């Protein structure tokens, strides 16, 4: 494994655990709760993170179709309930791409990490490694949001679910 990827693997592994716990004790109706207009629900955040994982896979040369027509790729969008996926579908997309990513990460070499990504990310260098670091941090940000929303729903936060049981 390339040395630059090792800390990213650690964070993505931790994120996998947090993401799995985000589904605990939630049904589809509860997960769609929005606490104010133009705010994210748990369902929206989970789908956004699954879409982001597909982007991470793309950075590594993995090919998977962008789920849900890319509706969850950027920023909260006005979507009707009939277009919002159910939790089990979101979990499956995350699981499939995450499994492929975790297998691919140890295979990455310096040349793979220095490739210019097809999308631009808010990083000082325009490389796959910088984009991978950004998207990993992006996951952590949204996992924090998920944890907070779970607590608003009177459910335990993600840290408590993963480490304090």
Which residues does each predicted region cover?
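Basic/polar N-terminal segments that are highly enriched at the extreme N-terminus
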Residues: 1-6, 165
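Short, contiguous alpha-helical
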Residues: 9-13, 20, 30-76, 118-165
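Hydrophobic alpha-helical core bundles mediating ligand binding, dimerization, or RNAP-core interactions
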Residues: 12, 16-19, 23, 94, ...
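Residues within well-ordered alpha-helical secondary structure of globular protein domains
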Residues: 25, 48-51, 96
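Surface-exposed helix-capping loop/turn segments at secondary-structure junctions
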Residues: 25-32, 103-115, 151-156
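Acidic/histidine-rich alpha-helical segments that form the ligand environment
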Residues: 78-118, 129-137
